[in-house]
Design a protein with these regions (language model features):
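Structured catalytic core of nucleotide-sugar glycosyltransferases
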Residues: 1-129
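Residues in soluble alpha-helical coiled-coils and helical-bundle/repeat scaffolds
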Residues: 11-14, 100, 104, 171, ...
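Acceptor/aglycone-binding surface of glycosyltransferases and processive sugar-polymer synthases
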Residues: 70-72, 76-86, 102-183, 199-218
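Hydrophobic helical membrane-anchoring modules
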Residues: 181-319
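Solvent-exposed polar/charged
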Residues: 57-60, 85, 111, 115, ...
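Short, hydrophobic secondary-structure boundary micro-motifs
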Residues: 35-36, 120-122, 152-155, 179, ...
Length: 319
């Protein structure tokens, strides 16, 4: 069988050579035994350092190295979609370009695939993570699994192996706003989860900071359910009920006050501020959904290819 290793890159010039050497060594060791052939597909997601030049050098030295360069940074989700679309292996394994996904896991994932699993997922431990990072991650999974239409498992990373059948299902979904962790779960198929210890980044800095993590979390929650909209409706009815009770309470005070009734100025101001804030939050939630619809109806491509050594990708590229 042929295995494709899919790696998305963004400014990874400091670690790319080390990553390629480690993964290539592992694949070469499997060649002729577990594998009949392999390819390593690099997606350069708009790097502005020497990442692409290094990829070109690797491709000149080894015809098993394939690459696609985007015209700008389209994001990891688009990079993985492009890789799935143009990879030619019987199965495709997604790995990080910084060696946080250990290459020694490749044979374990391949063995699970040969056992009949269409999806093999890596689940990392949280050993060594910062308290803030691990707390945020656990909070995200707690909230998402109570609001989303799919179940996400804490620790499941982008380290995945998909069969050709699973890949075809994945790329058949045309939505522009993609949340891969949810899409992997949505397509279903027989899955095996392999736990592993996440390695430290070998060089360079992470491109997925707190802000991107927050945006990614919001993207996931918005993409896979409409419950925030229902919460707005439910809270609206609750507020209506409370308002009716408050009016009834004030009416009783007026009736039994015998002319000494004085309206609550501070209560009124507090209520106005409270409900104004709630309205702004709900308008923001509506805006998020409307914004997603806005991007969906444009039907823009998920990515634009600037350069590639894959013939089919050349044919599909603009210009």
């Amino acid at each position: 069988m042929k295995l494709s290793i899919l790696i998305t890159l963004l400014n990874e010039e400091l670690v790319l050579a080390q990553t390629h050497a480690a993964i290539s060594a592992q694949l070469e060791d499997m060649l002729g035994k577990d594998l009949s052939d392999y390819e390593i597909l690099y997606i350069d997601d708009g790097s502005n350092d020497k990442t692409f030049e290094l990829i070109e050098e690797l491709a000149r030295d080894n015809d098993r190295v394939k690459y696609i360069r985007f015209s700008r940074n389209f994001g990891r989700e688009s990079g993985i979609l492009a890789g799935f679309k143009y990879a030619t292996g019987d199965a495709v394994m997604v790995m990080d370009g910084d060696l946080q996904h250990p290459p020694y896991l490749i044979p374990l994932f391949l063995e699970a695939y040969k056992e009949g699993y269409d999806v093999v997922s890596g689940q990392r431990t949280r050993d060594g993570e910062s308290f803030v990072g691990s707390t945020f991650a656990r909070l995200f999974y707690f909230l998402s699994n109570r609001s989303m239409d799919v179940h996400l498992t804490d620790g499941k990373s982008e380290l995945r192996l998909l069969s050709r059948k699973a890949i075809n299902a994945f790329i058949s979904m045309p939505e522009y706003n993609r949340f891969n962790k949810g899409l992997y779960e949505w397509i279903g198929f027989k899955e095996k989860v392999i736990p592993y210890k996440n390695e430290l980044r070998k060089a360079g800095k992470s491109k997925f900071g707190f802000k991107k993590s927050m945006n990614y979390a919001i993207q996931g929650i918005i993409s896979f359910n409409d419950r925030p909209l229902r919460v707005c409706i439910q809270f609206g009815f609750i507020c209506l009920g409370l308002a009716i009770l408050y009016l009834f309470f004030e009416l009783m005070k007026y009736i039994f006050s015998q002319g000494d009734y004085v309206s609550g100025y501070f209560t009124t101001i507090a209520a106005i501020i409270l409900f104004s804030g709630v309205q702004l939050i709900f308008i923001g939630i509506l805006g998020e959904y409307i914004g997603k619809i806005y991007y969906e109806v444009k039907r823009r491509p998920h990515f634009i290819i600037e350069d590639t050594n894959i013939e089919k990708a050349k044919e599909d590229s603009i210009g």
